Amino acid sequence: MIWYILIIGILLPQSLAHPGFFTSIGQMTDLIHTEKDLVTSLKDYIKAEEDKLEQIKKWAEKLDRLTSTATKDPEGFVGHPVNAFKLMKRLNTEWSELENLVLKDMSDGFISNLTIQRQYFPNDEDQVGAAKALLRLQDTYNLDTDTISKGNLPGVKHKSFLTAEDCFELGKVAYTEADYYHTELWMEQALRQLDEGEISTIDKVSVLDYLSYAVYQQGDLDKALLLTKKLLELDPEHQRANGNLKYFEYIMAKEKDVNKSASDDQSDQKTTPKKKGVAVDYLPERQKYEMLCRGEGIKMTPRRQKKLFCRYHDGNRNPKFILAPAKQEDEWDKPRIIRFHDIISDAEIEIVKDLAKPRLRRATISNPITGDLETVHYRISKSAWLSGYENPVVSRINMRIQDLTGLDVSTAEELQVANYGVGGQYEPHFDFARKDEPDAFKELGTGNRIATWLFYMSDVSAGGATVFPEVGASVWPKKGTAVFWYNLFASGEGDYSTRHAACPVLVGNKWVSNKWLHERGQEFRRPCTLSELE
């Protein structure tokens, strides 16, 4: 009976080499200008075609009047020598000119421009990446398909709608990934919009074809059968649906016979009371991460909250900050996470972004087994590295970090600038190397990453928080601020509570830059204590 499963097999075209637009909102803005240029070129082409048609129309109207007069008295008309001459001239010369005008291709300029710009277009991987980002945002922020389709997202300035065809394409992307849960959600949304009367290039038969199979793959045979019957009402000759109908009915009959004795056990399971909600502390990391991204589950006792303060910080009497101390705020106690306010100016931010933009490349991670740098699905951003010697602003920023932390930046890594893409994120990770990764920073020769300094260089309309799932902390982006924490205890042991993540950007454009400071050079700046965990 396996031959009955004819149900859908779709392959996306192979992706070509591309710049990975979907991983950086900053670079995606270039596409807006590209499309604007193409629209201008297209309008020029339309104007040229309209001018051409106007000339042909005027010529046709003139000849229509002339031939109407001539056909009333052909002999009398050509008996006039001027008319005879003009008739010869028109047929010998002017009709040839008209033929050339009609055959003239006005699209050359537009096609030429389109061909030039096409090399900068996103490709299949970009489109699929953007689609997956929507699915990721849907899960992380508990958004239903109707909310996304209608563009009702928090903080949006430019509301945008999804057509039934768009919803269908999202469902197809999920299907290609064998993600039948999202396939069902988006095919149902497409079907809903079609049922509401939306005019579309897709039809209900195609949607039901995918939907019935997605439901079947999730084990809901009754619903799959119902949807298949609905499809056959619209297209009784649909070969795959007819095959599936027989297969579903066969499976249901077989299950009914085999599982009769087990039906009582199943009913007992259904009546079993549900377990009480699990405390946030004991949820799997993925759930805690998503809850924190939504601003849920963040709890700190009043006693702990009383230990959090705001203060002016002069960098241990650093001359640069005595008259204008830095504004410091405690974000969390264990691990201690500090935010510095108004610590980088808008002008400095723009210079850093301008330096980074031409160098932005897809962000990578170090493979713990091979040590090779590679792109991964859980880190969606582009990054660039800036050295202090190449621009005085970068050098000044580096020294500011040293003055405020008291740590030596000469052994730190270069300033990393990152711009997050559609649904841009970096799932939970450690900044420091664990004991099973002894060679992680061996080539640097500066030891482990003792601390992290993170600048927020843009406000984010929705999403994009930095969260610490182990402890329940969430730090929200605020332009011009920076956060700082130690990854290692003073003993050099890793602080596993610093495991953190960059939440997906729901709406907006997130720019950050960070400085990873290393152990070497800090021996007397942050000496170890007698305890491993201090």
UniProtKB/Swiss-Prot annotation:
Domain Fe2OG dioxygenase: 411-519
EC id: 1.14.11.2
Tissues expressing the protein: Expressed in the heart, liver, skeletal muscle, kidney, placenta, lung and pancreas.
Binding residues for 2-oxoglutarate: 510
Major subcellular location class: endoplasmic reticulum
SUPFAM superfamilies: TPR-like
Signal peptide: 1-17
Function: Catalyzes the post-translational formation of 4-hydroxyproline in -Xaa-Pro-Gly- sequences in collagens and other proteins.
Protein name (record): Prolyl 4-hydroxylase subunit alpha-1
Organism of provenance: Homo sapiens
